[in-house]
């Protein structure tokens, strides 16, 4: 089993605050820094990835649009969506970018299987799908051999804002969520399973779940 990860449960936090913290953490870390996983939800926000095109923002309305340096196109975050950010030293864990993407996709597939939901990844588009419908989006950034950003799993949320964009740059892509397929399932049910499956696939362990670290996130 590889070295232990720090797990942080951040609750509901503005996207820009957490993005700032990820950058600050990654810029400050050394080869001795522990890897971290952050579990968080965001207030409603559209985020444009590095490859994002304005044409895929159809009618954002009053929902803010934030530029992100993660990979990919536009997506939507909102309460009831479990976001998991993975801040990993890829060299130390002997992971390539493709293998990390595969690990995250496998994490979602295994998590959903625990709720009797059959899901799959696609070779032509990152993420996890139920049939033709997308349930989880992925977007990563690598800096100094370390990853940040991560995945967003739709659990029990308002999906209607996805109709205001071409999700991940695909016109007409339908989104689905865990609670539509396993009624009554919420974030509190999914989050511990998601974390456990990720740690299992990484062959990693974790200590007690922590909250904000003011050194990186502010108070």
UniProtKB/Swiss-Prot annotation:
Species assigned in the record: Sodalis glossinidius (strain morsitans)
Domain of life of the organism encoding this protein: Bacteria
GO cellular component: cytoplasm
Annotated site, Lowers pKa of active site Cys, chain positions: 134
Location relative to the cell: Cytoplasm
Principal localisation: cytoplasm
PROSITE patterns: BPL_LPL_CATALYTIC (PS51733), LIPB (PS01313)
Record-given protein name: Octanoyltransferase
Pfam family name, one: LplA-B_cat
HAMAP family per record: LipB
Stored InterPro entries: aa-tRNA-synth_II/BPL/LPL (IPR045864), BPL_LPL_catalytic (IPR004143), Octanoyltransferase (IPR000544), Octanoyltransferase_CS (IPR020605)
Pathway: Protein modification; protein lipoylation via endogenous pathway; protein N(6)-(lipoyl)lysine from octanoyl-[acyl-carrier-protein]: step 1/2
EC nos: 2.3.1.181
């Amino acid at each position: 089993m590889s070295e232990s990860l720090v797990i942080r449960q951040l609750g509901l936090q503005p996207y820009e605050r957490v993005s700032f913290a990820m950058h600050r953490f990654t810029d400050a870390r050394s080869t001795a820094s522990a890897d971290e996983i952050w579990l968080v939800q965001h207030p409603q926000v559209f985020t444009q990835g590095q490859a994002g095109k304005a044409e895929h923002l159809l009618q954002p309305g009053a929902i803010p649009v934030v530029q992100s340096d993660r990979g990919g196109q536009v997506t939507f975050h909102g309460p009831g969506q479990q976001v998991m950010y993975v801040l990993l030293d890829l060299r130390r864990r002997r992971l390539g970018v493709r293998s990390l993407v595969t690990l995250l996709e496998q994490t979602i597939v295994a998590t959903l299987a625990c709720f009797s939901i059959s899901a799959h990844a696609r070779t032509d588009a990152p993420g996890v799908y139920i049939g033709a419908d997308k349930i989880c989006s992925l977007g990563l950034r690598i800096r100094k051999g370390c990853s940040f950003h991560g995945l967003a799993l739709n659990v029990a949320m308002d999906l209607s804002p996805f109709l205001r964009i071409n999700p991940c740059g695909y016109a007409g892509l339908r989104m689905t969520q865990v609670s539509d397929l396993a009624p009554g399932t919420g974030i509190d049910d999914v989050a511990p399973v998601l974390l456990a499956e990720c740690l299992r696939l990484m062959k990693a362990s974790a200590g007690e779940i922590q909250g904000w670290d003011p050194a990186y996130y502010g108070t």
